[in-house]
Amino acid sequence: MPTISQLIRRGRETVAQKSASPALRECPQKRGVCTRVYTTTPKKPNSALRKVARVRLTNGYEVTTYIPGIGHNLQEHSVVLVRGGRVKDLPGVRYHIVRGALDTAGVQNRNRGRSKYGAKRPKK
């Protein structure tokens, strides 16, 4: 334990916070191009076919991103907007694709939580 005079001379070293989404480089979102669109299976105890895409970002990083919602129109060379946010049961997936932005269509027939899935307000 340092003395008061040692602390005055040197101070305490601050521990740098590690980013949860380093490929975004402090940006809220980044644009990218899909290089591969596929499905993968989650960790135990869950079971499903989760839709994911490999995306090359404008800064050169290549990341694995999750495609949220039911159904999607993405294929190779689709231009997408990527945000942070991991998927707990998919190891290595630390980013989400923003639905309803750029080439990604919003989720069809979605009535609740529409803003999260890029769905327009339904007609009366």
From Swiss-Prot:
Annotated positions of the 3-methylthioaspartic acid modification: 89
Name of one Pfam family that matches: Ribosom_S12_S23
Entry's Gene Ontology BP terms: translation
Composition bias type Basic residues, residue spans: 111-124
PROSITE patterns found in the cross-reference section: RIBOSOMAL_S12
Region: Disordered, residue numbers: 103-124
Zinc in keyword set: no
Xref: HAMAP family: Ribosomal_uS12_B
Physiological role: With S4 and S5 plays an important role in translational accuracy. Interacts with and stabilizes bases of the 16S rRNA that are involved in tRNA selection in the A site and with the mRNA backbone. Located at the interface of the 30S and 50S subunits, it traverses the body of the 30S subunit contacting proteins on the other side and probably holding the rRNA structure together. The combined cluster of proteins S8, S12 and S17 appears to hold together the shoulder and platform of the 30S subunit.
Protein name as catalogued: Small ribosomal subunit protein uS12
Organism of this sequence: Desulforudis audaxviator (strain MP104C)
Name of the gene: rpsL
